[in-house]
Amino acid sequence: MADLKAFAEQLVNLTVKEVNELASILKDEYGIEPAAAAVVVSGGGDAAAAVEEKTAFDVILKSAGASKLAVVKLVKDLTGLGLKEAKDLVDGAPKPVKEGASKDEAEAIKKQLEEAGAEVEIK
């Protein structure tokens, strides 16, 4: 048990360079592809290695613009909300219209809302 604790302590104290060398050894000699998160956790602040491609996006309605009625109808259709709920969402802007959407879906929703006159943001 003490050996594992000492090993864990050594692993936690590795520098970024040492972690990269360890990753290379694991990949080349043992065929193990280390997870990016494990490398980053013990990397000690290498922010560039922590960059991940975002896969879930939120479509935020910032304002309804001039044609509020068209935006309310579109929000109703896009979200499946009732007319009153869709109106409340539009009136309460900025609010999310869709959360956790794929990039393509978020872009499509944004395009539709902007064509209806709304101001939209993707986060």
UniProtKB/Swiss-Prot annotation:
Record's GO cellular component terms: cytosolic large ribosomal subunit
Pfam families: Ribosomal_L12, Ribosomal_L12_N
InterPro entries linked: Ribosomal_bL12, Ribosomal_bL12_C, Ribosomal_bL12_C/ClpS-like, Ribosomal_bL12_oligo, Ribosomal_bL12_oligo_N_sf
Residues passing through the membrane, by range: none
Function: Forms part of the ribosomal stalk which helps the ribosome interact with GTP-bound translation factors. Is thus essential for accurate translation.
Keyword check for Ribosomal protein: yes
Record-given protein name: Large ribosomal subunit protein bL12
Entry keyword set: Ribonucleoprotein, Ribosomal protein
Organism from which the protein derives: Cytophaga hutchinsonii (strain ATCC 33406 / DSM 1761 / CIP 103989 / NBRC 15051 / NCIMB 9469 / D465)
GO molecular function annotations of the record: mRNA binding; structural constituent of ribosome
Ribosomal protein recorded as keyword: yes
Gene3D superfamilies: 3.30.1390.10, Single helix bin
Biological process, per Gene Ontology: translation
